């Protein structure tokens, strides 16, 4: 079991996980385990009784060495203060203000497909593109050091540090070295130093009264103070944005493009929608509300391949949900991977059917059976940013290009920090006529 968890935790879940409301395992290697697939119990754990559920030890052992007190890993008063301080940063006004940067970064990137010969790895390309978008919206491209090396170290860091180690499953203390993640330490140190230098560089400009761009970094520095963010917390959250903000959206975009190549009839509808909207609407802020089919395809891709395939919690005190007793210390796994493919919650759960998410059908989906961004107090603060970014990328990309599968392509999903295609997504790209 430990070997499977290290290789790919998604392989653990057998047929009962896709049919039962919950599964309780009392004799697990890492202690008692509860797998949650019931929307009512999801709401109980993540919303109604969220105060009783802390971040699970296994999850913290993986993420905390990288993110420290970023929003994904901070708890208690630190999390409350950080969330309150950052809420104004993620208002619609600021997110809408980043649309033009998203467009320019996407336009600059996708030009590389103009003379593409042979397969391109869409999974890797979407990772690079969303990093470029994040570099523009977070730093306005003003990164200390060599930007190319920064992007490379980001990829290496989350590739090596995001794996589950056997010691994590056994809940070993963090001072015990995880051999599987030693390679990532150099990348982490390099990565943190660049973030520190970039923050200092921007702060010096602000102190000198020099004009600075209205990007995420400037907004975060303005949130610094006794009641806001400390300098260390600003840096931790920048690293969190880079990890959660570009990796998760990139994976969802890659899966969307692959699924549309498999379902050419769906792709044709989306191409027609994109052509019609872009012909009459120049403002990218308006694209999301005017492209319901494109949005539905992206949301359906996140159902089949959720960016975060598991949400791990641990009760602080004994709890009860109807006749289910949840003991203190139990590893509670809210599982978007199985929840999104559950036989009793979805019609044809393995099929790619974007129509599920069209406006006229949304009311049939329980809020707590679909969790691409989580739920409750710790719902993803950047969900609106991610949705805007995804639609802009898909609109500009699919307006100009069409992607086809390479012969025999059947990607195997692997859980690391996100749901990734093992071996990438090699696809053929051609200019649309």
Regions found by a protein language model. Give the residues of each.
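Conserved cytochrome P450 K-helix/beta-meander segment immediately N-terminal to the heme-binding cysteine loop
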Residues: 334-361
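N-terminal membrane-proximal hinge/A-helix region immediately C-terminal to the signal-anchor transmembrane segment
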Residues: 1-81, 96-111, 129, 144-145, ...
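Conserved cytochrome P450 K-helix E-x-x-R motif and the immediately C-terminal K′/meander segment
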Residues: 2-23, 193, 197, 281-322
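Cytochrome P450 I-helix active-site segment
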Residues: 99, 103, 152-156, 208-218, ...
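Cytochrome P450 catalytic-core helices
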Residues: 248-267, 271-273, 384-399
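Cytochrome P450 proximal C-terminal region
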Residues: 17, 106, 110, 126, ...
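Cytochrome P450 heme-thiolate monooxygenase catalytic core
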Residues: 54-60, 78, 94-251, 269, ...
